[in-house]
């Protein structure tokens, strides 16, 4: 039996958002660096790590179910992630209360604690194959795109959210460390870098925007300077940079010219949540929808190709029909390209639970459906304008029906797709990770169709 065959094997289940996915990638990278093998099955693993989500009730249940399945199928389970930091009404750890047989429980962003638990229950091999770990680390995404997490935690105290209680206040990564990871990812063949955090706009606030150094030159720990540097680096590799979770602080205006100049994709993911000032105040969010509309108009004047994505909550406690109508009017006037809407769901530990005026489930869901009806009309109208245009598309998948890819307006998993007809000539063949020029021939409310 070879040393590789004898390596202790760890199974891994990763749930939740892209930030949690990055945590999973870091844990798996460290496991491989220490010589552990990763098992794709429960019965092939010596123990299983489950990285959980705990933001909303559905995510909590999904995580608890996944832990239960891992215990049933394997029996040795270490739990990490946001659910690991949640307590029940009595102050007890939720995971251990429901699944007392788990070996260990940690919160999110806890690489050291997870590895300590793994070492305790599955000692590491003496001669790890550190040369098997690429400089870019091990990624759980397709080879052609990757998430780059620039900070951890959040300084906001939105009434509907418990992320700060699970992930803590904002902690920005050193700017040189971020740039080095980005460079390693591009060198590894990544064609699209998705910048994520809980609050991308606040990058560097915690360190007072101190100046770091990258390639011998000063570089401020601040979103604008980081985005410009990432854009310059991406250009050397012909790659994309996409920004997510950008709170609409005033200095966000500074990155729009960078988008228009081609340094980063003209794509802005801005979580607005609502449009009525009273609802926004109850949410403890910035409360000036008129100013937001003015800024959106100004952004589009500077960058006409800008795609704006946002998320909203319908049926927040105390939301009146008039307040909801204000939200619908805002969506129609703002003409946001991509939106998601959630019917409000109470989150244990959130201060919004104490607000008066909780709405019945059916009202919340009915408002969500009405919201999406308006939003999809806007999306269909804006997508129809792209028919006849030629767009640069990144191929995600190739099958017998042709290709499936995404334009600059589409982030993976949350936005639309571009369906591409099979190539008419051998010279037009493409594969996953290729950029191709696609003439758009059709559109619906979410996706595009085209041909090379």
From Swiss-Prot:
Binding-site list for [4Fe-4S] cluster 2: 154, 158, 161
Documented EC number(s): 2.8.4.4
Residue stretches making up the MTTase N-terminal domain: 8-123
Organism for this UniProt entry: Cupriavidus pinatubonensis (strain JMP 134 / LMG 1197) (Cupriavidus necator (strain JMP 134))
Protein family membership: Belongs to the methylthiotransferase family. RimO subfamily.
Keywords, in A-Z order: 4Fe-4S, Cytoplasm, Iron, Iron-sulfur, Metal-binding, S-adenosyl-L-methionine, Transferase
Keyword Methyltransferase belongs to the record: no
Domain Radical SAM core: 140-381
InterPro entries membership: Elp3/MiaA/NifB-like_rSAM (IPR006638), Methylthiotransferase (IPR005839), Methylthiotransferase_CS (IPR020612), Methylthiotransferase_N (IPR013848), Methylthiotransferase_N_sf (IPR038135), NA-bd_OB-fold (IPR012340), Ribosomal_uS12_MeSTrfase_RimO (IPR005840), rSAM (IPR007197)
Function field: Catalyzes the methylthiolation of an aspartic acid residue of ribosomal protein uS12.
UniProt domain TRAM: residue ranges: 384-452
Name this protein carries in UniProt: Ribosomal protein uS12 methylthiotransferase RimO
């Amino acid at each position: 039996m070879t040393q590789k065959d004898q390596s202790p094997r760890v199974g891994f289940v990763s749930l939740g958002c892209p930030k949690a996915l990055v945590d999973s990638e870091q844990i798996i990278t460290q496991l491989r660096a220490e010589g552990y093998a990763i098992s794709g099955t429960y019965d092939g693993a010596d123990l299983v790590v489950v990285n959980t989500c705990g933001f909303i009730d559905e995510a909590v249940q999904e995580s608890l179910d996944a832990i239960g399945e891992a215990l049933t199928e394997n029996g040795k389970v270490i739990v990490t992630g946001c659910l690991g930091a949640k307590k029940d009404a009595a102050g007890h750890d939720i995971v251990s209360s429901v699944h007392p047989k788990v070996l260990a429980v940690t919160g999110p962003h806890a690489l050291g604690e997870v590895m300590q638990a793994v070492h305790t229950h599955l000692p590491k091999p003496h001669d790890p194959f550190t040369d098997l770990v690429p400089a870019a680390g091990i990624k759980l995404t397709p080879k052609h795109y990757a998430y780059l997490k620039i900070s951890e935690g959040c300084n906001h105290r939105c009434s509907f959210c418990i992320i700060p209680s699970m992930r803590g206040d904002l902690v920005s990564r050193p700017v040189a460390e971020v740039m080095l990871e980005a460079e390693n990812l591009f060198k590894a063949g990544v064609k699209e870098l998705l910048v994520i955090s809980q609050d991308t706009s606040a990058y560097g606030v915690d360190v007072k925007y101190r100046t770091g150094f990258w390639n011998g030159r000063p570089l401020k720990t601040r979103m604008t300077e980081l985005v410009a540097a990432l854009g310059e680096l991406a250009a050397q590799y012909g790659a994309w940079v996409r920004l997510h979770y950008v709170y609409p602080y005033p200095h966000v205006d500074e990155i729009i010219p960078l988008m228009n100049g081609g340094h980063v994709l003209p794509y802005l993911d801005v979580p607005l949540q609502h449009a009525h000032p009273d609802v926004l105040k109850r949410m403890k969010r910035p409360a000036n929808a008129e100013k937001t509309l003015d800024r959106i108009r100004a952004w589009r004047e500077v960058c006409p190709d800008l795609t704006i994505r946002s998320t909203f909550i319908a049926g927040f406690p105390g939301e009146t029909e008039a307040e909801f109508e204000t939200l619908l009017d805002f969506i129609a006037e703002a003409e946001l390209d991509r939106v998601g809407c959630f019917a409000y769901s109470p989150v244990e530990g959130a201060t919004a639970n104490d607000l008066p005026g909780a709405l019945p489930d059916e009202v919340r869901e009915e408002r969500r459906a009405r919201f999406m009806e308006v939003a999809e009309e806007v999306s269909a109208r804006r997508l129809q304008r792209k028919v006849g245009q030629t767009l640069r598309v990144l191929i995600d998948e190739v099958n017998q029906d042709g290709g499936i890819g995404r334009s600059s307006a589409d982030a993976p998993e949350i936005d639309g797709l571009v369906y591409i007809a099979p190539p008419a000539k051998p010279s037009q063949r493409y594969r996953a990770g290729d950029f191709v020029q696609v003439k758009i021939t059709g559109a619906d409310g979410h996706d595009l169709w085209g041909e090379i």
